[in-house]
Amino acid sequence: MSRKNFGAKPLTYPQPVFIIATYDENGNADAMNAAWGGISEGDELSLCLSAGHKTVKNLLKTGAFTVSMADAKHVAECDYVGIVSANTVPDKLSKAGFTTTKSENVNAPVI
């Protein structure tokens, strides 16, 4: 999957599935789907996340995350990331077929 930095834009249409990615305390990449989110300011996202998710716990510990958006070509992989918990399947990103690299901007993985 190719990556593209869209920069700060004031809209998200059609409504995407946001994929929030973090590192855990051991540096392992994790991600979750966030369907409840959108642009609240021209350069700011608002997301509704449950504290019970491992990804959210990672985010609260590290203070860093990245946001990717699902595309039609990767529906099955993105669905897997949203259904399976890293609490039970620690390597769920690789099992989904995704690879990650470290973000150049924050201490979090980019899918």
Regions found by a protein language model. Give the residues of each.
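Active-site-proximal mixed secondary-structure blocks
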Residues: 1-32, 38-111
